[in-house]
Design a protein with these regions (language model features):
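Extended, amphipathic alpha-helical stalk segments that mediate dimerization
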Residues: 1-149
Length: 149
């Protein structure tokens, strides 16, 4: 069991920067009340966040940059530093050429292989609408948008 976990961690580190993903999501949680993007309410992980921002990275990064600048100049705000950190972390992912948006905005996974066990408790075939991106053409990171029978 321990060896399997270690192998999994090694694979994850090789294919995608997972530790930074955790940091990215922590920072996002601290400042999400300052963001007025539509996807904020449906973002439950760093994967969701990146998939959303990749949908129109120029728009989101410009807005986030402006918001961070505005908050940094506002002496009453304590979120400026965190917004700037969120911008830096997101920018690092977006400019990483290994990230590619999936060509189709939604795809169907009939095998449910991308579902985690707790999300597919019935073990029945379900139609899953996915969005996401690939990292280095090796790892596909999906966000589950909808599950239907």
């Amino acid at each position: 069991m321990i060896q399997a976990n270690q192998e999994k961690e090694n694979l994850e580190q090789k294919h995608a920067p997972y530790q930074k993903l955790e940091k990215l999501y922590e920072v996002f949680l601290e400042v999400k009340d300052r963001l007025n993007f539509n996807f904020v309410a449906t973002t439950h992980s760093a994967m969701d966040l990146i998939a959303s921002v990749l949908s129109d990275s120029k728009y989101y990064l410009e807005n986030l940059y402006n918001k961070a600048s505005q908050e940094l100049s506002d002496k009453r705000s304590d979120k400026g530093e965190k917004l700037a950190e969120l911008f830096d972390l997101l920018f690092e992912y977006i400019k990483d050429s290994k990230f590619e948006r999936l060509k189709e905005p939604s795809a169907y996974d009939h095998s449910c292989k991308t579902l985690y066990p707790e999300q597919n408790s019935s073990q029945k075939m379900q139609r899953v609408v996915l969005r996401g991106y690939t990292y280095d053409k090796k790892i596909a990171c999906h966000t589950i948008v909808d599950m239907g029978s």
